[in-house]
Structures are given as structure tokens and as C-alpha cells.
Regions:
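Nucleotide/pyrophosphate-binding catalytic subdomain
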Residues: 1-181
Length: 181
């Protein structure tokens, strides 16, 4: 059976200061089709916890403690939304949160691999995010990097990144005006 990692960014999951529910429904519909009709194992790496938290509490997202607070508020809101949407297709979801140290620890990475295999064997869709509440710096960049790690560690056949960026840039186009595709 083929294994696919899909990473979705905050910009796709939010619209203004709200969750983009129609986009999320479209994503859930796509994943459900891939899982049920195409018989693929799907792992979802989802950003959006901070954005979802911001829909409830307006804090300055440039302050680390505020960002962590927003993630603490937003992660359960995001998971509840996913759970309700996937439930319409009869699909169970599970949450897995990681920090960079988890990939440096043989014991933790082995435990995560064991859990992942059990989830996928039982047709559960794992939804993965960085554990922003305890992370003091983003995992070597962001959830795009996390998705690459997940693809490698869990031996996925393909990684698909859903984003609002036009393509692969040689540097971050939000920080460098001379970034090239």
C-alpha cells in the first residue's frame, strides 16, 4: 500500500482571522477519497494551531509566549474541526505532536514509529503538528521541514505540500525581495 504525506499550511487553513472551513472541507474530502477510493495511507501534517488560536484571542504573534499560548488554544480547536469533518466520512483521526528533540531520541522516534504503524494499520489518519507549546524554536524552519522529516521517518512514498506560495524559492520570499523560483 502506498503511503502519502500531505502538508497543509496556515495560509491555506485560514482566511482573514477565521478558519477557512470550506477549504478544510475540500481537503478532508480529498484525503477521504485518497484513503477510501485509492486505498492510500495518508498522513496529514497540519499547521494552523496558532492561526486557530488567534481566532479566539488576539495576541501579538511575534512574541514567543503569545505564539505558544495561541497554539495551546488553537490546537484543540483545529483537531475538533478535523475530527468532525472526517467523522462525516467514517474516518477516525489521531493527533501526534513533535518537537525537534523527538527525532534525536531513538526511544521517542521508535515509539512514534510504533504508534504510526498501529494507526495506519487500523485505517486511522494521523494529524501531525509541531508541539508549538513547548518548542522554543521552530523545527529547523517550519512544518514544511517537519513534513520532510515525517516523510523520511515513516517511509512515505510521496510528500505533497499545499501552500499559498507560487513554487520553490531559493530563499524565503517574505523576507527577501530578490527570492527567485
Amino acid at each position: 500500500m502506498k503511503r502519502l504525506v500531505i502538508k497543509v499550511g496556515t495560509a491555506v487553513l485560514t482566511q482573514g482571522e477565521e478558519l477557512a472551513l470550506q477549504r478544510m472541507k475540500n481537503l478532508v474530502n480529498l484525503i477521504s477519497t485518497l484513503k477510501n477510493d485509492k486505498n492510500l495511507e495518508v498522513i496529514l501534517v497540519s499547521s494552523g494551531a496558532v492561526g486557530a488560536g488567534y481566532t479566539e484571542l488576539k495576541l501579538d504573534k511575534t512574541v514567543l509566549a503569545n505564539k505558544q499560548t495561541l497554539a495551546a488554544i488553537g490546537q484543540p480547536k483545529l483537531m475538533k474541526t478535523y475530527q468532525e469533518m472526517f467523522q462525516e466520512f467514517g474516518i477516525t483521526v489521531a493527533q501526534m505532536l513533535f518537537i525537534a528533540d523527538d527525532f534525536d531520541s531513538r526511544k521517542r522516534s521508535k515509539n512514534a514509529k510504533n504508534v504510526m504503524e498501529i494507526l495506519l494499520q487500523n485505517k486511522v489518519i494521523p494529524i501531525i503538528n509541531e508541539n508549538d507549546v513547548i518548542a522554543t524554536e521552530e523545527l529547523i524552519g517550519d512544518n514544511d521541514q517537519l513534513a520532510a522529516y515525517i516523510t523520511h521517518y515513516f517511509k512515505a512514498d510521496m510528500l505533497v505540500i499545499l501552500t499559498d506560495i507560487d513554487g520553490y524559492y531559493d530563499k524565503n520570499p517574505r523576507e527577501f525581495s530578490d527570492a527567485k523560483i
